[in-house]
Amino acid sequence: MNVVLKPAGQELVLTRDLNAAPARVFAAWTDPRQSSVWWVPKDCTLLSCELDVREGGAWRRRMRVPDGSVVTKHGVYREVSPPDRLVFTYNSEYADGRIDPETLVTITLAELAGGRTRLTLRHSGFWDEASRVSHTGGWTGAMERISDFFPA
């Protein structure tokens, strides 16, 4: 996996080559039953997952984090272009009432030889270095889990 970190306020880019065709990977992002398996950091427990996958539709995921508190991640789909592109806003709400500023996630799926897919995740709009680093850890775990979801 490649990780590219740019100056604060810009973007985080992660790539992963997966053992599945783009349509299957797109479904893993858009089907709640599939995304519930992998779209959560390894040290967290997913409590709920709601996906209204259409432009203007909302998504919402609640998870229990290692300290026992509940964090809600949510946003709105800006672009849904199966099987190769998904764009959505990304917000975090914490048990103590904090709400992070909205950011933007773009998922691009490129077909590779042998029925494989290159997944590129771009997360932009971070407000500071600490936020970007924190999201890098979370997304890296999710990328490991989606890779495991499509074993060789």
PLM feature spans:
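Hydrophobic ligand-binding cavity/cleft-lining segments
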Residues: M1-T45
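Charge-dense, helix-prone N-terminal extensions
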Residues: V4-G9, C49-R54, R62-V65, T72, ...
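Short beta-edge strand/loop motif at the mouth of beta-sheet-based domains
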Residues: V13-L14, R33-V70
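Hydrophobic/aromatic beta-strand elements that line small-molecule binding cavities or substrate pockets
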Residues: R16, S48-L51, K73-E79, T103-E111
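Hydrophobic pocket/interface hotspot
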Residues: V25, S35, W59, Y77, ...
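Short, conserved beta-turn/loop elements at beta-strand boundaries and strand-helix junctions
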Residues: S81-L86, G114
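Beta-strand/loop substructures that line and gate deep hydrophobic ligand-binding cavities in soluble
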Residues: T89-T140
